């Protein structure tokens, strides 16, 4: 079972990764997406078909978080490939994330332990690092303003950025397609849950 851990620059990252996996002949991944991302009907249509399930980050109840973790643990344990953004939110500055969120990512370890305990066939869980490189970022203006603001580092959810407007997303897509530029999705070498590189021949 694979756990993909990409860098995170835009709300378009998840659909882009889903498309890249499809083009590479790789299986799709399930992933948690903020409830605010489903406010755009067009993107909601595609995201729900790319394996996204909703996560309401405004809910702080312990029960809600436990249910999300149990769902993720069970899905990975049953062999569902998963995607987690280890930074937890989009990078405001474009730099690689250093303050990693271990919440849902930790469910991979729990799923692996449960699989070993129940002696399931093929219990191995591998982490695949992934980087994204863009010429343009849809929400760049909003993210830059947020990074420069005093409260930028503490804000977690931006619910009214460019992604919420279907017309803006369509206009952005046209501009990107008219550029002589490429978007890169790079998959790194798989690692086991202890961080050790895995021999490709053993996969």
Regions found by a protein language model. Give the residues of each.
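C-terminal, non-catalytic macromolecule-binding modules
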Residues: 200-203
């Amino acid at each position: 079972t694979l756990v993909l851990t990409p860098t995170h620059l835009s709300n378009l990252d998840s659909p882009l990764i889903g498309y890249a996996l499809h083009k590479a002949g790789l299986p799709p991944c399930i992933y948690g997406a903020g409830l605010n991302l489903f406010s755009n009907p067009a993107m909601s249509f595609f995201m729900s078909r790319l394996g996204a399930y909703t996560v309401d980050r405004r809910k702080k109840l312990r029960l809600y978080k436990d249910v999300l973790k149990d769902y993720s643990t069970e899905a990975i344990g049953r062999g569902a490939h998963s995607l987690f953004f280890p930074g937890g939110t989009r990078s405001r500055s474009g730099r690689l994330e250093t303050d990693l969120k271990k919440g849902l990512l930790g469910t991979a370890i729990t799923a692996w332990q449960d699989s070993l305990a129940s002696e399931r066939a093929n219990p191995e869980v591998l982490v695949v690092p992934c980087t994204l490189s863009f010429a343009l970022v849809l929400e760049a203006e909003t993210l830059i303003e947020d990074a420069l603001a005093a409260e930028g580092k503490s804000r977690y959810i931006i619910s009214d950025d460019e992604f919420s407007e279907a017309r803006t997303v369509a206009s952005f897509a046209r501009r990107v397609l008219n550029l002589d530029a490429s978007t890169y999705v790079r998959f790194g070498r798989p690692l086991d849950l202890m961080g050790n590189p895995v021999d490709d021949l053993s996969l």
